[in-house]
């Protein structure tokens, strides 16, 4: 979502995501892992104020970010792929925890790419190509809502948006490294999920809670809890009465799924 706020600035909303399903199918020859997942945006969001300038990149953030952050990479890859020469000023108000598996960095990058695409009239197909160069989850965030995601994350099939659900989140304050979590996987862990992602999507649409519980899966959850057994204490008191409780992404956040309005954050539709 883009809102013009005057003086050449625009305010962007950057939503978090959940992995309602996430499995790793194997390791590819290029070093990436082949995944399959059901992704869903939720109402937890960061806010970015952006302004195009003559030259340079300027970022003011409410939390510390690395110098090679995803917002800067989005700006660099956009310029490289389009040949457009311009600078960018960004103010980021962060609400999505860093290292939580909620996709905040990828969502920030996608919000900037979507805005630049509107300004410079770049087609979505070209933006998707740029997004894949910025990060594996970035293409999904150009769509948002509900999607089946494959490949290393760059193959996105938009699905009918799931509505009528909400979640509570548990963040144990641990920064979970995506790279380390993938390195912790062994071939025996691949393809262990039910694999019926389309069926899980239908179960959400049909409010089949029993099937949702049966088909939900995250390959990283067991690995994460083995690395951080202390998290179990907090999880015992989290998500009472929920439909399902599970980890998102490569951690460290967990979500508890409820019917609409019972959780703090609602499912958000896509573009």
Swiss-Prot record:
Molecular-function annotations in GO: 4-(cytidine 5'-diphospho)-2-C-methyl-D-erythritol kinase activity; ATP binding
Enzyme Commission no: 2.7.1.148
Keyword Nucleotide-binding included in the entry's annotation: yes
Annotated Pfam families: GHMP_kinases_N
Catalyzed reaction equations: 4-CDP-2-C-methyl-D-erythritol + ATP = 4-CDP-2-C-methyl-D-erythritol 2-phosphate + ADP + H(+)
InterPro entries: GHMP_kinase_C_sf, GHMP_kinase_N_dom, IspE, Ribosomal_Su5_D2-typ_SF, Ribsml_uS5_D2-typ_fold_subgr
Residue numbers binding ATP: 97-107
Presence of keyword ATP-binding: yes
Alphabetically ordered keywords of this record: ATP-binding, Isoprene biosynthesis, Kinase, Nucleotide-binding, Transferase
Name of the top EC class for this enzyme: transferase
Transmembrane segments: none
Involved pathway(s): Isoprenoid biosynthesis; isopentenyl diphosphate biosynthesis via DXP pathway; isopentenyl diphosphate from 1-deoxy-D-xylulose 5-phosphate: step 3/6
Catalytic site positions: 17, 137
GO biological process: isopentenyl diphosphate biosynthetic process, methylerythritol 4-phosphate pathway; terpenoid biosynthetic process
NCBIfam families: ispE
Protein task: Catalyzes the phosphorylation of the position 2 hydroxy group of 4-diphosphocytidyl-2C-methyl-D-erythritol.
UniProt record similarity statement: Belongs to the GHMP kinase family. IspE subfamily.
Protein name listed in UniProt: 4-diphosphocytidyl-2-C-methyl-D-erythritol kinase
UniProt organism field: Thermotoga sp. (strain RQ2)
Gene name, Swiss-Prot/TrEMBL: ispE
């Amino acid at each position: 979502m883009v809102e013009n706020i005057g003086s050449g600035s625009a305010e962007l909303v950057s939503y978090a995501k959940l992995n309602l399903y996430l499995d790793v199918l194997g390791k590819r020859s290029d070093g990436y892992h082949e995944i399959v997942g059901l992704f869903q945006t939720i109402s937890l969001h960061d806010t970015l104020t952006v302004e195009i300038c003559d030259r340079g990149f300027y970022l003011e953030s409410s939390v510390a970010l690395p110098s090679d952050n995803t917002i800067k990479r989005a700006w660099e890859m956009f310029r490289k792929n389009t040949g457009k020469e311009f600078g960018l000023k960004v103010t980021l108000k962060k609400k999505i925890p860093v290292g939580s598996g909620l996709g905040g960095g990828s969502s920030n990058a996608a919000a900037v790419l979507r805005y630049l695409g509107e300004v410079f009239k770049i087609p979505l197909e070209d933006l998707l190509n740029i997004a894949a160069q910025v990060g594996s989850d970035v293409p999904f965030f150009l769509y948002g809502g509900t999607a089946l995601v494959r490949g290393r994350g760059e193959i996105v099939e938009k699905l009918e948006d799931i509505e009528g659900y909400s979640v509570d989140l548990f963040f144990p304050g641990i920064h979970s490294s995506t790279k380390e979590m993938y390195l912790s996987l062994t071939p025996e862990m691949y393809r262990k999920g039910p694999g019926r992602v389309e069926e899980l999507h239908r179960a959400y649409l049909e409010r089949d809670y029993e099937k949702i519980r049966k088909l939900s899966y995250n390959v990283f959850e067991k690995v994460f809890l083995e690395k951080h057994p202390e998290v179990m204490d907090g999880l015992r008191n989290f998500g009472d009465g929920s439909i399902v409780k599970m980890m998102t992404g490569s951690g460290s956040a967990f979500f508890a799924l409820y019917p609409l309005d019972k959780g703090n954050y609602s499912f958000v539709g896509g573009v």
